[in-house]
Design a protein with these regions (language model features):
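Eukaryotic N-terminal low-complexity, Ser/Thr- and Lys/Arg-rich leader segments
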Residues: 223-231
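ADP-ribose/adenylate-binding Rossmann-like module
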Residues: 10-28
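Proline-centered loop/turn at the N-terminus of a beta-strand
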Residues: 16, 41, 60, 182-184
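Rossmann-fold dinucleotide-binding core
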Residues: 4, 22-105
C-alpha cells in the first residue's frame, strides 16, 4: 500500500480507501492511522475466499473501520462479496481474518499429517477422505458445546479431562513414529498438553489449554516479518 500511495500522498485527502491486503491487525491499524493523517477515509477488509470466489453469493468479506464510511460504501463493496461489518476498530477485520486462517492452516496441516500416516500404512487419500470429512464435520458440535463454558471461564472435567487427552496425543506420537513419519506436529501438540498438565489442569477439560495459550512459553520464537508484510 505504502509503495503505491506514498509518492502521491498529497492527493489522498477526501478519498476513501479499502485495504484488502492480508496482514496483521496492528499493521491494519497503522495503515488506517497513516491514511487518516493524510485526510483520507479508510476501511479494512478481510476477504474470506480466493480470487475464484469473488462475485459468488456465498462469499463474504469482513470489514472494519468507521461505520459511516462502511455504510456509504456497502453497496459498492457487495459487488465483490457479501459484507460482514465487525466494528469501528480498523484492526478487527484483519483479526477475524487471521483467526480464520489460524484455524484453516492448523486444521489442514493436521489433515495432511493424517494422510501421510495413512499412506505409510497403505491407505490412500481417497480411502481416508470420507473419514476425514466425518471427523471435520463433527467439530461444530464440540464448538457449540464448549463455547458457553469457555466464555464463563469454566473448564470442568465432566465430559473430558486434559490428562486423558494427553494420553491420546501420546498414542498419536507413537503411531506416527511407528509409521516412520515425521512426528514434529503431534509432538508439538503433546508439548502443549504437557504444559497444561504442569499447570495442574490434568483433571480439567482440555479446553483449559486456553489458559496455557494465554501465557506464552518462555521459548517462543519471534515470528519472522520477512514474508508477512503485504501493505
Amino acid at each position: 500500500m505504502y509503495a503505491i500511495l506514498e509518492n502521491d500522498s498529497d492527493i489522498l485527502a477526501g478519498k476513501v480507501f479499502v485495504n484488502l491486503s492480508s496482514d496483521t491487525p496492528e499493521k491494519a491499524r497503522e495503515a488506517a492511522k497513516w491514511l487518516t493523517g493524510h485526510g483520507a477515509s479508510h476501511l479494512t477488509g478481510g476477504v474470506q475466499v480466493p480470487p475464484s470466489g469473488i462475485g459468488k453469493p456465498e462469499s463474504f468479506t469482513f470489514y472494519s473501520g468507521p461505520l459511516d464510511v462502511f455504510e456509504s460504501q456497502k453497496e459498492l463493496l457487495e459487488v465483490l462479496t457479501s459484507t460482514d461489518y465487525r466494528g469501528e476498530d480498523p484492526g478487527l477485520a484483519a483479526l477475524y481474518y487471521q483467526i480464520g486462517m489460524d484455524m484453516f492452516w492448523t486444521g489442514m496441516l493436521s489433515y495432511l499429517h493424517a494422510v501421510a500416516v495413512g499412506k505409510a500404512n497403505g491407505i490412500t487419500a481417497e480411502q481416508l477422505k470420507p473419514h476425514a470429512i466425518s471427523t471435520m464435520a463433527s467439530l461444530p458440535q464440540f464448538i457449540e458445546f464448549y463455547t458457553p463454558r469457555i466464555d464463563a471461564g469454566e473448564y470442568p472435567g465432566d465430559v473430558d479431562r486434559l490428562a486423558m487427552g494427553a494420553a491420546s496425543v501420546e498414542h498419536i506420537v507413537h503411531t506416527t513414529h511407528d509409521a516412520g513419519i515425521d512426528t514434529s506436529l503431534p509432538e508439538a501438540v503433546l508439548e502443549i498438553f504437557k504444559r497444561g498438565l504442569a499447570n495442574g489442569r490434568g483433571g480439567d477439560s482440555f479446553t483449559s489449554l486456553i489458559e496455557t495459550f494465554m501465557k506464552p512459553a518462555d521459548h517462543v520464537i519471534e515470528p519472522s516479518r520477512a514474508t508477512t508484510s503485504h501493505l
